[in-house]
Amino acid sequence: MMPQTTPPPAGLCVQDLTVRYGTAAVLQGVSFSVPVPGQLIGLLGVNGSGKTTLLKAAAGLLPHTGQCLLDGVTLESLSTRRLAQTVSYIPQQSGISVSLSAREVVLMGFNPRLGVLQSPTAAMRAAADEALRTVGLADKAGQDYLTLSGGEKQLCILARTIAEDAPLLLLDEPDSALDLANRSRMTALLAQLVHTGGKTALVCLHDPALALDSCDILVVLQGGGVAAVLHPRTDPPAVLQAALAAVYGPLELLPVTDCRGRRRLALLPL
């Protein structure tokens, strides 16, 4: 009889992740797992709790100990090219400072699949235009990226992420430059991308109310460690309230029904 092998764990697993700047540990032994793909994971915590550091470490941009696994594959073991095909990282600032059209920015998402000096194919160009249409920027495809508004730039970078088609998305406050309407659009697009595409997204969010409303799972950081892992759809409001209040200070969560009949939680600081 052949020995049975244990299948690799599905989803995202962060194991004992530690990041140091000099002698100071910014993250210390961070561990959590989300064993089901297709989840939008909100990363919460006050300024300085290590949210951005965690994203950068998972993206392979910071030296660290511990490891991150996606569907059983250790990200730290991947080549630079393979890691770029597996992980799509979106920082708070795009870093783009040269004149490129919005379409050209989206086409950058295909770079990990192209050889040296290889140009995007016609199919890639069509996919880039479709991604821009999805985020509502079809009419901006030929416009210089640098002339777009802050919110349009964020949506353009999201279109690049759609084109990239990586299984793991790491996004650092993608809503930071968006108005109320576009924040809702951004989170709805992210949820659709994750849920229909079977992807896993770890999203750093500044606003716990937005995270409660849009995320499937919340990982709350405090002092460089994991304070709580929460499930907004199933955890009792009292559990969510206590965990968030321990990090953000006094607050109250009130179950409400919106005008469309959806049950939601309103967050009120006290």
Put a short name on every predicted segment.
Residues 44-46:
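The feature captures the beta-strand-to-loop junction immediately N-terminal to the Walker
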Residues 59:
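Helix-to-loop junction immediately C-terminal to a conserved catalytic motif
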Residues 66-74, 83:
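Conserved ABC transporter NBD signature motif
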Residues 107, 122-140:
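Conserved ABC ATPase "signature" region
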Residues 144-148, 152:
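Conserved ABC ATPase signature
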Residues 169-173:
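Catalytic Walker B motif of ABC-type/P-loop ATPase nucleotide-binding domains
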Residues 237-270:
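ABC ATPase nucleotide-binding domains
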